[in-house]
UniProtKB/Swiss-Prot annotation:
Family, similarity comment: Belongs to the conotoxin J superfamily.
GO cellular component, as recorded: extracellular region; host cell postsynaptic membrane
Name this protein carries in UniProt: Alpha/kappa-conotoxin-like fe14.1
Positions of the propeptide segment: 25-39, 65-76
Disulfide bonds: C46-C61, C50-C63
Organism: Conus ferrugineus (Cone snail)
Signal peptide feature range: 1-24
Function: Highly inhibits both nicotinic acetylcholine receptors (neuronal (alpha-3/beta-4) and muscular (alpha-1/beta-1/epsilon/delta) subtypes) and the voltage-gated potassium channel Kv1.6/KCNA6 subtype.
Keywords recorded for this protein, A-Z: Acetylcholine receptor inhibiting toxin, Amidation, Disulfide bond, Ion channel impairing toxin, Neurotoxin, Postsynaptic neurotoxin, Potassium channel impairing toxin, Secreted, Signal, Toxin, Voltage-gated potassium channel impairing toxin
GO terms, molecular function: acetylcholine receptor inhibitor activity; potassium channel regulator activity; toxin activity
Superkingdom of origin organism: Eukaryota
Tissue: Expressed by the venom duct.
Residue numbers bearing the Arginine amide modification: R64
Lineage summary: Eukaryota, Metazoa, Spiralia, Lophotrochozoa, Mollusca
Coiled-coil ranges (or none): none
């Protein structure tokens, strides 16, 4: 029977790899066209984080140069 530590390690590794594979705009990562539903929550989180100025808290979000929908100003 696998130990709790090894199961936890495998789950964390799987989550890190799956996030890296479906992060849009990241250089060198695979863009899997069949996984649009997996990308949607991440892009929604990034849009909200960039809009509220909290994009720096999420390393997978790229907020530079995106227009702020509310004020039409450039987000930093």
């Amino acid at each position: 029977m696998p130990s709790v530590r090894s199961v936890t390690c495998c789950c964390l590794l799987w989550m890190m790899l799956s996030v890296q594979l479906v992060t849009p705009g990241s250089p060198g990562t695979a863009q899997l066209s069949g996984h649009r539903t997996a990308r949607s929550p991440g892009s929604t989180i990034c849009k909200m984080a960039c809009r509220t100025g909290n994009g720096h808290k999420y390393p997978f979000c790229n907020c530079r140069g995106k227009r702020d929908v509310v004020s039409s100003s450039m987000a930093v």
